[in-house]
Curated annotation (Swiss-Prot):
Keywords: Blood coagulation cascade inhibiting toxin, Complement system impairing toxin, Disulfide bond, Glycoprotein, Hemostasis impairing toxin, Secreted, Signal, Toxin. It comes from Lutzomyia longipalpis. This is Lufaxin. Sand fly salivary protein with antithrombotic, and anti-complement (alternative pathway) activities. Is a slow, tight, non-competitive, and reversible inhibitor of factor Xa (FXa, F10). Is specific for FXa (Kd=3.86 nM) and does not interact with non-activated FX, or all other enzymes tested. In addition, it blocks prothrombinase and increases both prothrombin time and activated partial thromboplastin time. It also prevents protease-activated receptor 2 (F2RL1, PAR2) activation by FXa. In vivo, it abrogates edema formation triggered by injection of FXa in the paw of mice. It is found in: Secreted. Residues 1-23 form the signal peptide.
Length: 301
């Protein structure tokens, strides 16, 4: 699309006409789209004018720094993915993953108060929201994949150090820390933290998912921990409501210790910002004694 046509379309949007913008733009995602997902919503918006044009009854607003859309599906569906494409295209950077978030609702629910932190040059955006039937609202298959032993829920292979044979931190995804002992990852709205380390000889045991109907500000799950199901490593993923660009990370920890003397272990989720979906990948090793920590990580997990 040439610049004249692009400016003409943006002009129509700014005067309240709903026109799909089709040219190169910067893409932002929450969640992961699959071909069988249903389109719940699609619209184009101008990002410079307030009040913005209401589409299908969903309220929206613009200020100097943010665009906000209040979406709630009238179908019996839960949100599986959200895509925002902004125009014109600007060089992307690693910080983009934090510029789109749901203040309330989100993946796994039927609503999202969608907040987009704009840049000055961005003047229009397409928004696409997808969903799946609410009766089950399971995303396990799309985040486990075909090879959960070797590939994480971001689609990245687990990599190991030579000294211990334990997995190493990711360096090609946004990373944050708390108290220098807890590491959090974040991409496309999907958060992650890991409890202890994955060893090359571990086995993938199961994936436990917790959907929105079972999630509170504080909740827990019970995991088996005996014989061949002795827990060696947990890879924990979730979506959460985020009030600001800087999220408040949850506290995820065992209730007490998870030692080889425990037949079960309780994993506790203690949150300030409500989760909307969680997935725990459980890895096991009958030889694990629960001491898989490095000196610099004391206090982690």
């Amino acid at each position: 699309m040439n610049s004249i046509n692009f400016l003409s379309i943006v002009g129509l949007i700014s005067f309240g006409f709903i026109v799909a913008v089709k040219c190169d733009g910067d893409e932002y995602f929450i969640g992961k789209y699959k071909e069988k997902d249903e389109t719940l919503f699609f619209a184009s918006y101008g990002l410079k004018r307030d009040p913005c044009q209401i589409v299908l009854g969903y309220k929206c607003s613009n200020n100097q720094t943010h665009f906000v859309l209040n979406f709630k599906t009238n179908k019996k569906s839960c949100i599986s993915a959200i895509k925002l494409t902004s125009y014109p295209k600007i060089n992307q950077n690693s910080d983009l993953t934090k510029n789109l978030y749901c203040q309330t609702g989100g993946i796994g629910t039927d609503n999202c108060k969608l907040v987009f932190k704009k840049r000055k040059r961005q003047i229009a955006a397409n928004i696409e929201i997808y969903g799946i039937p609410a009766k089950k609202c399971s995303f396990k298959d799309r985040y486990i994949g075909a090879d959960p032993l070797h590939v994480d829920s971001y689609g990245l292979p687990y990599q190991f150090d030579q000294e211990h044979g334990w997995n190493v931190e990711r360096y090609n995804i946004f990373k944050d820390t708390r108290f220098s002992t807890e590491v959090f990852y974040h991409k496309n709205g999907l958060f992650n933290t890991q409890i202890t380390y994955l060893a090359e000889e571990d086995s993938f045991s199961e994936a436990r998912e917790i959907t929105a109907k079972d999630i509170k500000k504080k909740f827990s799950i019970i995991l088996p921990n005996e014989e061949y199901k002795r827990i060696s490593f947990l890879d924990v993923y979730w979506f959460q409501e985020t009030m600001r660009k800087k999220p408040k990370y949850p506290y995820i920890h065992y209730n007490g210790e998870c030692s080889n003397e425990n037949k079960t272990c309780e994993l506790v989720f203690d949150t300030d910002e409500l989760m909307t979906y969680a997935l725990v990948k459980v890895f096991t090793n009958p030889e694990s004694d629960g001491s898989r920590l490095k000196e610099e990580d004391l206090g982690r997990g």
